[in-house]
Amino acid sequence: MNDNIKLTEQEIIRREKLKKYESLGIKTFKKFDHEKINIYSNEIVEKYNHFSKDELLEKQIKLIIAGRILTQRGPFIVIQDTNGKIQLYVDKKELEEQKETLALLDIGDIIYVKGTLMKTMKGELTIKVNFFDLLTKGLTPLAEKYHGLVDVEERYRKRYLDLISNPNIKEIFWTRTKVISKIRKFFDEQNFMEVETPMLHSILGGANARPFKTYHNSLSSSFNLRIATELPLKKLLVGGIDRVYEIGRIFRNEGIDTTHNPEFTSIEFYQAYSNLEIMMEQTENLIKFIAKELGLSKIKNHDVEIDLLADFKKINMVDAVSEATKVDFRNIDLDKAIEVAGRYKVKVEKYFKVGHIINELFELLIEKTLIQPTFVTGHPIEISPLAATSEDERFTERAELFINTKEYANMFTELNDPLDQRRRFEAQLEEKESGNEEASEIDESFLSALEYGLPPAGGCGIGIDRLVMLLTEKESIREVILFPTLKKKQV
């Protein structure tokens, strides 16, 4: 043992118990070599709770279960498995051969149990233990009273303890699993192909974001961790896969707050022979499908009720900003736009054009008003380098879905003109040279693919973490990511 490790009194006692187990010839960290478990705690309640005490006594139902000890009170022990808790009853007289090991058990130990199902005088389902075995010894005590882990930072840092101490946390991640499963079901039933595309990209593209950089020694080449899956997925449309989607991790080297984590999970889907209207329809149908499958029609944000099954609203970005500022942003020059931005204390970067200012004012004035599901359309071309233009070529066929003031989805009629796409990339490169670190680079391999012909298409990206936040009514993205990114702990 490292002499520099300071142990608490409880930790010392538990290590002394290890020696006692050793003296009894019992391994404390063993391989599983028993008859396999045949039930989980929640199944016990579902299958047998309707039986009376006398009926259970007559049936003599034999069960095998395993779990972590949460409490010990006299002859009663409560264990927790993956699906819940169950009470055990230990009659020391019937376990005479195991009395020494029984006395060495601690809260936090993981045990294997064979027993007979019964009900107590109070009617609580309980397993009367016929045999038990210690599978794993807990050397560090759980938080006091097994629900004392309340420090938020510590909960995220030690998620394994959070899951033990706060059973409701596990429900969040079951919901997350179900959401991803329902997304797959939605697209699989429409004959979309699920694919996997590279995480290492030599050229930035698919979004405006700062990347994480890495280096491949064998290739002597620098790479970026992907900031989106868009460009390789659109290459697959060129290749004749007309309906395609990817669920995967995205990495963006940006700030951390309640809605942003540097690595997150997204779903991007692309459909040939479609457009923005079809993408909005698909997105609305997807969210309603998930809500129905999970039995959720309405969710609450503090005192506001959000109806996920009502028709989603639509507003135009430029019209909304014009109405809020009382300035016609469809007919305005850059100098006037800068003047209006100044009124609202918007910082104007040197690469800004009118479209950038419209977007900044939208984020400042409009986003906070979007509570019910709302599609925002008509984004300026300056902030939409991959979207097709609308009839007014200053704006694009793009939409974002906002719910409860947050963006949940981003969708386009995809730009399939390789010549226009090159001009857009070149404009992005000029922005990068003027200080926009998030601007896209010129991806020659993507342009080459477009020159073979990208069919008219629509595409959409949805942040799964935020969607789970919405459906579980959580305020922070860290609550729905098992191991969120945290600052290094100061020792």
UniProtKB/Swiss-Prot annotation:
Binding residues for Mg(2+) 2: E407
Chain segments annotated as coiled-coil in the UniProt record: none
GO CC annotations on file: cytosol
Keywords per UniProt: Aminoacyl-tRNA synthetase, ATP-binding, Cytoplasm, Ligase, Magnesium, Metal-binding, Nucleotide-binding, Protein biosynthesis
UniProt-annotated binding residues for Mg(2+) 1: E400, E407
Annotated signal peptide: none
SUPFAM superfamilies, per the entry: Class II aaRS and biotin synthetases, Nucleic acid-binding proteins
A Pfam family this chain is assigned to: tRNA_anti-codon
BP terms from Gene Ontology: lysyl-tRNA aminoacylation
InterPro entries: Aa-tRNA-synt_II, aa-tRNA-synth_II, aa-tRNA-synth_II/BPL/LPL, Lys-tRNA-ligase_II, Lys-tRNA-ligase_II_N, Lys-tRNA-synth_II_C, NA-bd_OB-fold, NA-bd_OB_tRNA
EC number: 6.1.1.6
Reaction equations catalysed: tRNA(Lys) + L-lysine + ATP = L-lysyl-tRNA(Lys) + AMP + diphosphate
Cofactor: Mg(2+)
Class of this enzyme: ligase
Domain of life from the UniProt record: Bacteria
Gene Ontology MF: a single term: magnesium ion binding
Localisation: Cytoplasm
Cofactor notes: Binds 3 Mg(2+) ions per subunit.
HAMAP family membership: Lys_tRNA_synth_class2
Entry similarity comment: Belongs to the class-II aminoacyl-tRNA synthetase family.
The protein, known as: Lysine--tRNA ligase 1
Organism listed in the record: Mycoplasmopsis pulmonis (strain UAB CTIP)
Gene name per UniProt: lysS1
